[in-house]
């Protein structure tokens, strides 16, 4: 298990780590199918091919995967794998009642992604004594 990182460190890692390490982390914590779903590919076996450097994901998939890494890493560090999965695949009021994983998969440009990591960061900071801020 990796040591928890600050949000700034997670952001730096997401930008600097080789894409294969990003994908391997997501596969370890979310599973191969969920990683494939987020990236926008239909065949989960592509994830293993990417890690093995047999292929590279397309640029838009790499952007999705790097954003997913940031959100996942923050949530796994704060709560563990199961809560991270539940957050990514559950409806999220801060994101217009859409699942973050769906938003990642559907993203076509940077603007489509910019609200996901801040929402994950806010949720990861929440504790039983300080729940996430709810919007009215």
Task: Go through each PLM region and give its residues.
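Non-transmembrane "mature" sequence context
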Residues: 1-136
């Amino acid at each position: 298990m990796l040591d928890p990182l600050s949000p700034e460190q997670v952001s730096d890692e997401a930008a600097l780590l080789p894409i294969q390490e990003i994908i391997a982390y997501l596969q370890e914590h979310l599973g191969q199918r969920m990683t494939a779903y987020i990236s926008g590919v239909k065949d989960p076996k592509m994830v293993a091919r990417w890690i093995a450097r047999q292929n590279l994901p397309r640029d838009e998939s790499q952007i999705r995967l790097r954003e997913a890494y940031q959100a996942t890493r923050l949530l796994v560090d704060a709560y563990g794998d199961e809560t991270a999965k539940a957050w990514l695949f559950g409806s999220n009021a801060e994101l217009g009642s859409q699942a973050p994983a769906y938003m990642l998969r559907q993203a076509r440009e940077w603007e489509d992604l910019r609200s996901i990591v801040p929402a994950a960061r806010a949720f990861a900071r929440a504790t039983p004594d300080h729940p996430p801020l709810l919007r009215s």
